[in-house]
């Protein structure tokens, strides 16, 4: 009962929840370009859906929440499931994370990882593909052969 109450509070207390700068434009571009993407979160479905709606993010093809995996971040399970549901191998996926547990999870899953505003003391931060301060620094293009280039 206590968890349900806390979950309700988290799902309804959405003041201050906003999309990261550049997130809406980036995700909209992915949709237009036909590039599959997922939201993979440690939050429960009610909390994740409420925050997703408040942030005004486009709808993902795949939504992985805490209920869908046995082990949460920093274990790789959530990102492995996200890749599977997208029909991709983990090494074909790019994880964009701001939390240390998420960075570790993405690396453990074998995905490429972009850390955005991750704390400087994030373990294994030196192993990620890119460290950025804003999603506005990312450009994504889909090549005629289907390859996706991230710069």
Regions of interest found by a model, annotated:
Residues 28-31, 45-151:
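Asp-based, Mg2+/Mn2+-dependent phosphohydrolase catalytic module
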Residues 8, 14-15, 37, 67-68, ...:
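A generic structural signal for short
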Residues 41-43:
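Conserved phosphate-coupling serine/threonine residues in phosphotransfer and NTP-handling enzymes
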Residues 1-25, 33:
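Metal-dependent phosphoesterase signature
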Residues 36-38, 112:
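Proline-centered loop/turn at the N-terminus of a beta-strand
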